[in-house]
Amino acid sequence: MKIENRTELKEYRIECQKKQSADCRVLVCGGTGCLASGSGKIYEKLKELTKDHTGVEVKIGEEIAHTKVMKSGCHGFCEMGPLVRIEPYNYLYIKVKLEDCEEIYNETILGGRPVERLLYKMDGVTYPSQEEIPFYAKQTRLVLKNCGHIDAEHIGGALAVGAYAGIEKALFEMTPEAVIQTIYDSNLRGRGGAGFRTGRKWQQVASQKEKIRYVVCNGDEGDPGAFMDRSIMEGDPHRMIEGMMIAAYAVQAQEGYIYVRAEYPLAIERLKTAISQAEAIGLLGDNILGTNFSFHLHINRGAGAFVCGEGSALTASIEGKRGMPRVKPPRTVEQGLWARPTVLNNVETYANVPMIVTNGADWFKGIGTPESPGTKAFALTGNVRNTGLIEVPMGITLREVIYDIGGGIQNDKKFKAVQIGGPSGGCLTEDQLDSKMDFD
């Protein structure tokens, strides 16, 4: 089925919402970390148990009579994986083992009761729902909102929670210039590290005389211990794809490339699936939603060279050349991919775009700080009690991240230092724990 216009998209979205409804939704973490810990077998076992029960059918991405078992993206609480979330109760089961599946099935799926021993406990307190757990309570999950809550391998789950509403609004209610102005007014800054104003970059590309332009996504996440972009690509690929589509509409580009390192095989597979499904229903390709806007998206696998995270080296790699940074100017906005004007942003930056277009620049500026609005995803790793993927408002302090979200240092040891920003970052000591996390 090809969606030909805005009305058909709205009707299809409603259909997807109906298909996603179920008396009980079981979301087994299908992120790389949990899969490595055995969540794939847990998923298959829960599926098998549900099938064996009379009157309950399990099929990924299809309408189900009573119970839906889905393989989601990363839930974020990697220290406690494998994770299983049960809705509508919002129970989050931690460190689930294969032998726990029958008890989960009998007690929770059939009986609605929590399996107490699988719930998170801290300092003598048991937290039944995911939202109450301190690790999640202080986060503001916007970019990661759907990760762990939707079937990452089926477009229906993404559409049911609002995917492609931003590009729909842009195509039917906004001019390309208005889209760029909205992103500029929001003061969204690049989440790849440099913090350059995204709207300004788009303005520079749109102002070029050359009419052939490209949109490129930098998914070459090379910093040791970083897995923010990987988790977005694995858990909510349509959000990033939609952001690229909006950028393409804004600068009048018709072709885009996602550059992903080959060490992210699951992210690549889920991106392939997402692109294929979007093409199948007409959300990618020619004359999207019956408009004059066409956009084709490709995936390019990187070989893992750290230097290819730099813009000019990345575009050279896509072209089949050696990934080496070049002298600037010209910059990628002037001569990027194949010497054409190119919008180049990272995964998290694009993932912010649909929300800004849908909700407006003022909404986005109401989060974070005036100079660094919005949120930022971080990979919290090392000698803390709760490692994982977090998303916090800009302006939060290091102390809040490490102690309120991370739970402090393991075994109550003394804090020594925190390394931030990968190889290009640095180390901060105890007297800097109240430093705010922002670009300035």
Report the location of each language-model feature.
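Structural motif
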Residues: 24-26, 66-68, 83, 91, ...
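Local cysteine-cluster metal-coordination motifs and their immediate loop/turn environment
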Residues: 23-41, 66-88, 188-197, 306-308, ...
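Terminal amphipathic helices with adjacent charged low-complexity linkers/tails
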Residues: 97, 105, 124-127, 255-279, ...
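Hydrophobic alpha-helical positions that pack around
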Residues: 268-394, 406
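Iron-sulfur (Fe-S) cluster-binding modules
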Residues: 1-28, 36-71, 87-185, 253-258, ...
